[in-house]
Amino acid sequence: MHICSLIPILFPKLLTCGLALYSAVVLWLKVSVIGSFIQGTVLLTLVPLILYAYFSTIAVGPGSPLDFEELRIRDLNDVETGMEFPPDFLAAKTVTLDSTGRHRYCVKCKVWKPDRCHHCSACDKCYLRRDHHCVWFPGCIGYNNHKFFLHFLLYASVYAFWICIITTWDLVVWFRAHSYERELLNVHLVCLWALSAAATVALTAFCAFNIYLVCKNETTGEYQRRSTLNSDLEMYADCTNGPRTVIENPFDLGSRRRNWAAVMGDTWKEWLLPIRTTASQKARHSFDESGLYFKIDEQAHAKLAESMALQARLITRFNSKRAVQ
């Protein structure tokens, strides 16, 4: 039973390493249409980057509110009765509340949930800015490892496309030279061509979709729950008696460049290499750039701030009435 439980964990890692190394060996030994210097440069650049980004995604992890002692709930009963509250630094900058207007918390993890934090049923744990659960790694993609995950997709897409082009070129040359009259077609080359063609289509499409989401500063989960976010904004508008403004994503910073930088960093070096962003390194001794709170659309922020102030006054009045009674 113990061995069976390790299969979902070890199989994706072994398969990823196996495919990367197998493709590199076949390209080096069987493809002859391109010089060894170029071939070696590409292989020695992309394969290590792919494996490094892959294992960095796993090692770094998505990040969890459980990593912060300040977010742990002491008594769930006190939370439910309104006797225990989230820390001030979190409450002051949180914009997404539950349907009752209270700060979100997780009963299973016994922790206060920051904006964009969600509980994964597969991992049975809350993760910061959770994007999705990916069996390929295996685990969740979240705030801390999202950048490494996207780097893996970018490197793997380029590598698959390179293999597809080179193997196609080699096969075309082989057929045009009528080599089939003298020798059999190499089965490893054909298999690699088929795998690379399929991987190019799948990885490029998935990579493009994730880049699209990053440029909108939106996670996969938020993309699916967009209607819920709009409902929250409508609720805030109702509380303030203001006009209803529909904003597709309140975390959209207004430009693709700013949204991209929020995840991938500000410089070309950060965009191209699987390294931590400069902003996260500078703020490593504070709660900034830790996935606990985020910049949001200014219009949405103003409206949400008004609604939160109103909700605070209403809660105070409600508690005062209860105390009198």
From Swiss-Prot:
Keyword Lipoprotein on entry: yes
Keyword Lipoprotein attributed: yes
PTM statement from Swiss-Prot or TrEMBL: Autopalmitoylated.
Cleavable signal peptide: none
Primary location: membrane
Domain DHHC: 104-154
InterPro entries hit by this protein: Palmitoyltrfase_DHHC, PFA4/ZDH16/20/ERF2-like
EC number: 2.3.1.225
Entry's Gene Ontology molecular function annotations: protein-cysteine S-palmitoyltransferase activity
Annotated localization: Vacuole membrane
GO BP terms: protein targeting to membrane
Transmembrane segment boundaries: 9-29, 31-51, 148-168, 189-209
Membrane topology, record value: Multi-pass membrane protein
Keywords: Acyltransferase, Lipoprotein, Membrane, Palmitate, Transferase, Transmembrane, Transmembrane helix, Vacuole
Regions of this protein lying in the Cytoplasmic compartment: 1-8, 52-147, 210-325
Residue intervals annotated with topology Lumenal: 30, 169-188
Catalytically driven reaction(s): L-cysteinyl-[protein] + hexadecanoyl-CoA = S-hexadecanoyl-L-cysteinyl-[protein] + CoA
Record function comment: Palmitoyltransferase specific for VAC8. Palmitoylates VAC8 at one or more of its N-terminal cysteine residues, which is required for its proper membrane localization.
Family classification: Belongs to the DHHC palmitoyltransferase family. PFA3 subfamily.
Domain notes: The DHHC domain is required for palmitoyltransferase activity.
Name this polypeptide is given: Palmitoyltransferase PFA3
Name of the gene encoding the protein in the UniProt record: PFA3
